[in-house]
Amino acid sequence: MHRLGSLLSHKPLLNPRAPLYSLISSSTFSYSPNSIEIFYEHLLKSCNGSSSLKQIHSALTTTGLITTSPHLGGQIIIKYAKFDDLNRARLLFDNINVCYDKPTSFLCNTMIRAYANVGQCFETLKLYSFMRKTGTFVNNYTYPFVFKACALNLLVREGKVVHGDALKKGFGSDLYVEAGLVDVYAKCGLFVDCRKIFDEMSTKDLVCWTAMITAYEQAEKPEEALVLFKKMQQEEGLLADSIAVVSVASAVGQLGDVRNAHTVHGYAFRKSLIEELCVGNSILAMHTKCGNTEKARLVFDMMMERDVISWNSMLSGYTQNGQATEALLLFDEMRDSDCQPTPVTALIMVSACAYLGFRHLGRKFHDFIVDSRMEIDTNLSNALMDMYAKCGDLEKAVNWFNGIPPTERNAGSWNVLISGYGMHGHGKEALELFSRMQEEGVEPNHFTFTSILSACSHAGLIDEGRKCFAEMKRLSVTLEDKHHACVVDMLGRAGLLQEAFDLIKEMPSPPSDGVWGALLLACKIHGNMELGKTAASNLLQLEPNHTGYYVLMSNIYAASNKWKEVWKLRQDMKNKGLKKPAAFSMIEYGEHILGFHTADQENPYRHEVYKKMESLAIEMKMAGYVPDLSCALHDVEEEDKERMLNYHSEKLAVAFGVLKIDPGIVIRVTKNLRVCNDCHSAFKYISHIYQRKIIVRDANRFHHFQGGTCSCKDYW
C-alpha cells in the first residue's frame, strides 16, 4: 500500500503529545501539493475538538497552505464556527483576505454561512454588503444563507432587498435561491408571497417541498402542511427524507390526528428513518400530542439512542395527558441514566407536581432544582409559583411573587397569581392584583382575562366580572371561546341561567363544548332540567363520546327522580362502550399518598376508616348535620342512600385524616371530580367538631374548611 494510503487509514491521525507538523516533517516520502491538501482535508474531517483544530491551523500556517489554499482555509473557518469560536473564524478570514486583491467568493460564502447558522443576521448582512462593495462575485450559494439569517430574525424588509438583488443578478429562478426565499417569506408570515414563489417554480426538488411543508408547520397551519406532504409523494413521486418527516410529524401532532399519526409512523419505520434521533423524537412527540402515550412510550423504549429532547418529550407527553405519576417514575429513570435534567426538564416536572397537587412532592422538586444549581429564569419561576398555588400553599405562592424583582416579572407572573387567588376563592384579591398589574404598565392578555373572569366566577363577583368582560372589548383583546365559557359559568353559578343562555346565542361563532359544558353544569347546580336538555343536546353533537356530559345530564335527571331517563342515558353510554369516570380521592400522609374510592376492597385501612366514618356520621347528626340525599344518584331506599353517601371517596379520605393525622396538621385531600353538596356540608361539621383545618382540592377549585365554614362561602 502507498505510504499515504496507510497514513490515511490509521486511527487516530493526531498524536496528542506531539505537534501536528512533526507528522509531516518526519515523513520519509515527498508529498505533492495535491496529496498534502488531501491529507489535511482528511485530518479536518476527523477533527472533533478545538485543540486538534488549533494544531491543524498551526501546521497549515507553518506550511503556508493557509493562504495558498482558500479551500483549506474555508474548511478551518467552518470548523471554528462549528466549535462556537466565531471570533477565531473571523480573524482567520480577515488574515487570508489580506493576501488577495479582493476576497474570494468561496471564503465569503463560508463566513456568511458560519454567521447565518448561529443567527448572527447583522454580521451576515454586513459581510454580504462587503462582498457587493468589493466586487466579490455573489452567487447562488450566497443568497440562501443571507435569506436564512433574515428568516431567523424575521427581517422582512432586508429579505425583500436581497430578493431584489438576486433577481437583478439573474439568480431569481435558481433552485437554492428560491428555496431560501420560500423559507424567509414563510417565517416572516408572508404566505401569499411564499406560496406564489413556490407555485411558480419550474422545478421543485425535495428541498423546496420540505421548505414549504416546514413553513406551514412552523406557522401552525398543519392542514396545509399535510396536504403538501401527500401531494409531494403521490403526485411528484418524491420520497420524504428525515427533515420532511420531522415537519409533517409536528403538523400531525398539532392536529391531534391519530390516523395520520399511524401513517407517518409507519412510513418512518419502513424507510428506516425512525432510527435517526431527530425523527424518533418527532414521532414520539407526535404520539403524545395525539394523546397516545402508550405508543409514544413504545417508540421511546425502542430508541437505540436518546438525548435530553427524547426524555423531555416523553415527560411532557405524560404530564400534558394527565399522567403525572408516570412522569415522576420516568424522571427517576432519567436521573439513573447518563442524561442530565435541564431547566426545560425542571419546567415539565414542576407542572407534573402542580397537576398532582401534593405539597411535599412540590417542595422536594424545588429542592432538587436548587441543589442542581439550575438557573431559575422567569418561566421556571412562574411555574414554581403556579405549583405552590395548585398544591394548596397560596401563601408561599404570594411570597414567591413578591420575591421576583419587578423588572423580571412578565405578564405570565401576574396571570399565575391572579389564577391562584381565583382557585382559592379570593376573588377580591385577584381583582386588586389585576388593577395593580395595569397600574404598573403590564398589558393584560387573553390569559389574564381567563384567570380574572374565572376568579370572579368562583367568588360570585358578578358585576365585577361583567366589567372585566367589557374591559376586554375596550382593550381590543380577542374574545375567545374560553372567555365566553368563563362568563357563562359565572352567570350560571349565580342562577342567571337565562342570561347565560342569551350570551351563548349572541356569540359570533358557534359555541364550543366548553361553553355548553359550563351551562350544563349550571343547570345541574340549579336543577334546570329543560335548559339542561338543550345544553346536553348541543354537547353530544359536538362531543358524542364525552362521558362527563352524559353523567352531568344523568345527575340532573336523577335529582328530579326521572329514573327512566337516567336508565336511557346509561344504556346509551353502555351501547357506545363509555364508562363513567370513577371518583377517587387522595390524601397526603407524611411523605406518602394514600388513595380512596368506594369500591376499594384492598385498602389496608379500609375497616378502620369505615368504622370511623360511621362514628363521624353520628357525631355530625348530633351537631345538626342533615344528609343531602339528592346527592345519592341511585334509585334505592332512603336509608341506603344515606349509607352510600357515607362512603364517598372524599369522606373516606377525610375520615382517615381525622383518624391518623396529628391534630394541628392540616388535612389535605385531592379529588378528581367536583366535591358533592353533601360532602361539602359534612366537612364543615367535621372541621368544627374536631377543630381541624381541612383543604380539599376538587376538579374546579380549593375549599378551605375551618371552624365550620368554607372559604368558598358555599358558592362553588
Per-region residue spans from a language model:
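Terminal (and in a subset, N-terminal) low-complexity or junction segments at the ends
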Residues: 2-205, 211-716
